[in-house]
Amino acid sequence: TMDTENYMNEKSAFIAIVGRPNVGKSSILNRLLGTKLAIVSNKPQTTRTRIMGVWTEGETQLVFIDTPGLIKPKNSLGDYMVKSVTSSVADVDACLLVVEANTKISKADEELVHRFKDLGVPALLAINKIDLLQDKSVLMEQIAKLSALYDFEAVVPVSAQDGNGMDALREELIALAEPGGHFFSEDTLTDQPERAIVAEIIREKALHALDDEIPHGIAVCIDRMKQRKGQNIMDIEATIVCERDSHKGCLLYTSDAADE
């Protein structure tokens, strides 16, 4: 039958997006999916959950695992975070290592490469934020240093901000897909429920409001979601739970300013 033929031709891959905090992993995931699923903020450690994004086109399905940003393991907590990323990598078919243009390769980058090198999985290297690149020699140094550590399938300079290079990156990822049935239906974007996605977006906005505050004490609870009758609008009521009173003041001030 036609369904059987389609199944026989299907290809898929589970891909872990890994890298240090704030190199743009969530932004790249959102660009690859064509929608906003992962929380994007300029604060370290803002990807709270292991949000999985699913991209399906024709016979190919790519399943992305957006791991928490890698912290250089200066202490036991940092070491735990590195191990958390490594455990995610162990479950995937390929890795996408994201580094930032204009910055030198750190020990944390090297450590991560060594950890998934032992697993023997194919890996791509994406150098993000090339729109901010001022010195091409820094880019060439990054490529040379990381390529000496690992035989990447491809090195792709990209800008998640303006989309430059993202089509080329997607094509390289598609090339990593192996024959095998799809794990998710065609219209699936994430394994996270709708309320979790909405809560993450609200939390992102709250983090942007707290420019000088540490973001670890904020949680968002969705109290109510209801489609507005006859309109393509969703009414949402949410509670933002703050660990510190100073957070409340910042958020209320920002809300009042937005209303004006």
Predicted regions and their residues:
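C-terminal end of P-loop GTPase domains and the immediately downstream helical coupling element
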Residues: 165-227, 237
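Conserved C-terminal guanine-recognition region of P-loop GTPase G domains, centered on the G4
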Residues: 87-152
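Switch II of P-loop NTPase G domains
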Residues: 45-50, 69-91, 102-114
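Flexible loop/N-cap segments at domain edges
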Residues: 234-236, 240-252
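Conserved nucleotide-binding/hydrolysis micro-motifs of P-loop NTPases
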Residues: 44-46, 68-71, 102-105, 130-133, ...
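Conserved small/polar residues in nucleotide/adenosyl-binding loops
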Residues: 254-260
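Canonical P-loop GTPase G-domain recognition
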Residues: 132-188
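Conserved G1/Walker A P-loop phosphate-binding module
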Residues: 5-72
